């Protein structure tokens, strides 16, 4: 599945399970790429606004070993007023096949469980101006080490931070 576009949509059914769902498994394999969604307004959904699942139907009897790849998933200007999860990514346990997922200018309110739920392997998931329940979601920690946080918080706390001497 490649080059899918959904834009300028309004979804407002109480029966809506997910807004954008990508499902595959190691029986099917293949590449799912260039999935684009923008300018979408959602009233509510039952599970996740975005769900990527590369382990769909794990008990399915089949010949396994065809690891699927999900890449280049892009959501911009998507709002949702109520859901259980914000973003849910279920990657393969042994291969990193989910990557380059971007959420930009998205706002999910009324998320009552986890805003970002990830299991298995995935990488390069980016959030740019993405808020859940009014809080900004970050792709990574704002500080590399706790000492950076400590220095910054002390500099904000003290009226004249240039007088601080951390060498002692």
Where are these regions (language model features)?
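Extracellular/periplasmic carbohydrate-active domains that bind, remodel
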Residues: 1-168
């Amino acid at each position: 599945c490649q080059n899918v576009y959904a834009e300028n949509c309004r979804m407002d059914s109480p029966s809506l399970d997910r807004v954008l769902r990508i499902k595959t498994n190691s029986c099917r394999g293949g590449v799912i790429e260039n999935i684009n969604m923008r300018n979408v307004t959602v009233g509510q959904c039952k599970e996740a606004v975005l769900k990527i699942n590369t382990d769909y139907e794990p008990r399915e009897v089949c010949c396994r070993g065809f690891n699927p790849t999900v890449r280049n998933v892009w959501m911009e200007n998507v709002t949702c007023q109520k859901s259980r999860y914000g973003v849910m990514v279920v990657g393969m346990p042994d291969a990193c096949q989910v990557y380059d997922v971007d959420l930009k200018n998205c706002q999910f309110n009324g998320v009552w469980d986890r805003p970002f739920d990830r299991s298995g392997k995935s990488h390069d998931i980016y959030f740019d101006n993405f808020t859940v329940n009014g809080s900004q979601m970050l792709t990574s920690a704002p500080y590399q080490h706790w000492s950076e946080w400590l220095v910054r918080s002390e500099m904000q706390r003290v009226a004249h931070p240039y007088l601080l001497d951390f060498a002692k």
